[in-house]
Structures are given as structure tokens and as C-alpha cells.
């Protein structure tokens, strides 16, 4: 979670220790605002990840963002997690390549999309099971930069010389800021009452097996 002013991060709180969204997010909001002598009324807008990602995490994050927007009368901005990752990497790599963010799904499956250097969508967001011929059509034409927490597990599968893997790129509120400000300036805001995150896959509830002692 972050607070930004004029495109710069002025406060950031992150946690990667597990699924603690329900207990941490509300605390982080209060802490960030208090530590910077702000209230929700001082915000221009609230940006939230629209997905894809964890069903529970997206649901809790969007619900909290909606609550702030309703309570303070602020606009809601939705940013694709994959687009945010691609934009962040494109800003620092500055290379005419295809940008392929990957979010880990399960086994050899990832949530992914393809963007060009300017952020235009080359291949829409989708779930894909990675095998050795994945992205062969793109890799035959230019470099493809792979990054995100889903890219680590496919390094040994995608062996093409044009496949470049960038380490240390993770989902972060800080990566959303550039696109969020761009959308805000363009008036690209969501209907707070009806906005729903992009889960990509339907949620399937499971019942844990009973442990045998």
C-alpha cells in the first residue's frame, strides 16, 4: 500500500508473509494516513489492483478501496496488476522488446499478458500453462522480457535465446502509481457501486481434509 504525490511515493507499507489481507490492509491505511498527517479527505483518488490475482486478496482490497471512496467521496481508479508490472519494467529497461509480466497461478500455469514498450496490449490477459513452445511466435521476432513471481518457475522451460528473465520484479503498490496518475488525468475512473475485480478464473471453494491424529 502506498501514498503518492506528483508521481512520487511518499509512503509505502508492504507485507509478503502470507494471506493476511483482512487484518493488515485496514491497519496500513490508518497508519499511512496518520504518519503523513493526512485523512482520506485529503486524497485526490484511490487506486486499486483490478487483478488478476488471488480471489480473496482482490475481494478484500477492492472492498476496502470502495469503502474509502464511499466514505470520503473520492473517485476509484482500477489498474491491472500485469499492466502495472509491465509499465514499471518498461520505464527502467527502455528497450524495444515485448514485455511479459507473469503472476504465479499453480503448477506451470501463470496469469500473463504481452505489452510493447509503450504499454500497448499485444496479447490480452489470460491464464497459460507454460511449455517449451509458449510465445514462440513472439520470440522469433524480438526479445521478450519475462518478469514477475510467475517467471521464476518457467526459466528452465523457455530456453529461446530471445527469452530474457528479469529478477526481483514483484507486485507492489509503488508499481501502480504511474498508470494510476495517467488514468486519473484522463478521467478513467470506475463506478464505485458496481466495480468488480477481474478474477480471471471462477472461485472454487474447497473443504480441507480432516486430519488423522
Write out the residue ranges for each language-model feature.
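N-terminal beta-alpha supersecondary unit
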Residues: 1-50
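Surface "functional belts" at beta-alpha junctions
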Residues: 8, 20, 75-171, 199, ...
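A general structural signal for well-ordered alpha-helical segments in protein cores
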Residues: 22, 26, 61, 65, ...
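Stable alpha-helical structural segments in soluble proteins, enriched in small hydrophobic residues
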Residues: 32-36, 71, 89, 173-184
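DPxDG-like acidic metal-binding loop motif
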Residues: 47-81
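Acyltransferase
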Residues: 166-213
Amino acid at each position: 500500500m502506498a501514498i503518492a504525490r506528483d508521481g512520487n511515493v511518499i509512503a509505502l507499507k508492504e507485507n509478503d508473509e502470507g494471506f493476511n489481507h483482512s487484518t493488515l490492509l485496514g491497519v496500513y491505511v490508518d497508519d499511512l494516513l496518520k504518519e503523513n498527517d493526512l485523512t482520506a479527505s485529503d486524497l485526490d483518488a484511490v487506486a486499486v489492483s483490478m487483478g488478476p490475482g488471488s480471489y480473496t486478496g482482490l475481494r478484500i482490497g477492492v472492498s476496502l478501496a470502495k469503502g474509502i471512496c464511499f466514505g470520503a467521496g473520492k473517485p476509484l481508479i482500477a489498474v491491472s496488476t500485469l499492466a502495472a508490472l509491465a509499465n514499471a519494467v518498461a520505464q527502467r529497461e527502455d528497450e524495444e522488446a515485448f514485455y511479459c509480466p507473469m503472476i504465479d497461478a499453480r503448477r506451470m500455469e501463470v496469469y500473463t499478458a504481452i505489452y510493447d514498450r509503450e504499454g500497448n496490449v499485444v496479447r490480452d490477459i489470460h491464464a497459460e500453462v507454460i511449455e517449451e513452445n509458449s510465445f514462440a511466435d513472439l520470440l522469433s521476432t524480438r526479445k521478450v522480457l519475462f518478469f514477475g513471481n510467475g517467471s521464476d518457475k518457467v526459466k528452465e522451460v523457455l530456453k529461446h535465446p530471445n527469452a530474457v528473465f528479469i529478477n526481483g520484479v514483484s507486485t507492489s503498490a509503488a508499481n501502480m502509481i504511474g498508470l494510476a496518475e495517467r488514468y486519473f488525468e484522463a478521467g478513467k475512473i470506475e463506478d464505485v457501486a458496481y466495480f468488480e475485480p477481474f478474477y480471471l478464473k471462477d472461485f472454487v471453494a474447497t473443504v480441507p481434509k480432516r486430519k488423522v491424529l
